[in-house]
Amino acid sequence: MTAALAAARAAATMASGSSGLAAARLLSRAFLLQQNGIRHCSYTTSRKHLYVDRNTKIICQGFTGKQGTFHSQQALEYGTKLVGGTTPGKGGKTHLGLPVFNTVKEAKEQTGATASVIYVPPPFAVAAIDEAIEAEVSLVVCITEGIPQQDMVRVKHKLLRQGKTRLVGPNCPGVINPGECKIGIMPGHIHKKGRVGIVSRSGTLTYEAVHQTTQVGLGQSLCVGIGGDPFNGTDFTDCLEIFLNDPATEGIILIGEIGGNAEENAAEFLKQHNSGPKAKPVVSFIAGLTAPPGRRMGHAGAIIAGGKGGAKEKIAALQSAGVVVSMSPAQLGTTMYKEFEKRKML
């Protein structure tokens, strides 16, 4: 960056008057945009950390709190390799038979953990995310709802300028590889190891899709709840890349909702990367078809603003990418089954 600024100053010196200064500004601006592009691209390299399995070692931030205790116990009973947790001031103690540490850095060094799940109240959740990023934990899953959006803008800014840590959430149910690893608050018993990758902005609709794919005998390969906030760490495109490159994932369910442009971006990604005779079947449902403009519908990000973010536009974009859009969340499982049947994949 220093070299570019020096070159810009030199250009300004050589040129006379305002035109020289304008040239310098343009040169500096171009370099900064290029640098930002490089930095932003580095975050995409962390997509690979979304894949978790029985060997993934996890710590819990907010380990000894009520929510942390309950869901850590559930994770252990599911068979997840939870290796410890953090609660500032309680380092050196044990909880649920596992060690408690004061800091994430210490917990990572002592346990070899590569993932962290955060059950910390909203006022302190961003500090917990920042601590995990600074400790270079590969995967951070933040369950907390109600984090101020201004705080998440700062977190997003930090995330986009590094490539070591992948954030899922906040305000999400988490990530699960059925039968192997459960990071989050989803009910483990409805999941069954199988062939469908599920990504969703809605927690409860994720469970609906999971239950249905289990009932029709397809099961799930990996499920990721990306959360319903406007500024989150992982979007549809990140998960789609994992699903398209995963041999165990033969079909994909994408559950979106009104607000933002994540679904449109996903449609564009699918056009580029999931076309032709070997394309994987993708089924989708978009919540909020009858939602009035300007009113937030549950999630902070579920709002139609400025005439954009409506369900009809999202459905049209997905259909143009070859996605089969279900008009009812109750038909996701049967729709996917029919797609498998049509392609002779059963």
UniProtKB/Swiss-Prot annotation:
Catalytic activity: succinate + ATP + CoA = succinyl-CoA + ADP + phosphate; GTP + succinate + CoA = succinyl-CoA + GDP + phosphate
Binding of CoA, residues: 64-67, 90, 143-145
SUPFAM superfamilies (alphabetical): NAD(P)-binding Rossmann-fold domains, Succinyl-CoA synthetase domains
Presence of keyword Nucleus: no
Enzymatic class: ligase
GO molecular function, one term: nucleotide binding
Catalytic site positions: 299
Compartments reported by the entry: Mitochondrion
Top-rank taxon, per record: Eukaryota
Sequence positions bearing N6-acetyllysine: 57, 66, 81, 105
Residue numbers of N6-succinyllysine PTMs: 57, 66, 338
SMART domains in the cross-refs: CoA_binding
Keywords: Acetylation, Ligase, Mitochondrion, Nucleotide-binding, Transit peptide, Tricarboxylic acid cycle
Pathway named in the protein's UniProt entry: Carbohydrate metabolism; tricarboxylic acid cycle; succinate from succinyl-CoA (ligase route): step 1/1
GO biological process, one term: tricarboxylic acid cycle
Transit peptide interval: 1-27
Role according to the record: Succinyl-CoA synthetase functions in the citric acid cycle (TCA), coupling the hydrolysis of succinyl-CoA to the synthesis of either ATP or GTP and thus represents the only step of substrate-level phosphorylation in the TCA. The alpha subunit of the enzyme binds the substrates coenzyme A and phosphate, while succinate binding and specificity for either ATP or GTP is provided by different beta subunits.
NCBIfam families hit by this protein: PRK05678.1, sucCoAalpha
UniProt similarity note: Belongs to the succinate/malate CoA ligase alpha subunit family.
Assembly behavior: Heterodimer of an alpha and a beta subunit. Different beta subunits determine nucleotide specificity. Together with the ATP-specific beta subunit SUCLA2, forms an ADP-forming succinyl-CoA synthetase (A-SCS). Together with the GTP-specific beta subunit SUCLG2 forms a GDP-forming succinyl-CoA synthetase (G-SCS).
Designated name of the protein: Succinate--CoA ligase [ADP/GDP-forming] subunit alpha, mitochondrial
Native source organism of the sequence: Bos taurus
Phylogenetic lineage: Eukaryota, Metazoa, Chordata, Craniata, Vertebrata
Gene name, Swiss-Prot/TrEMBL: SUCLG1
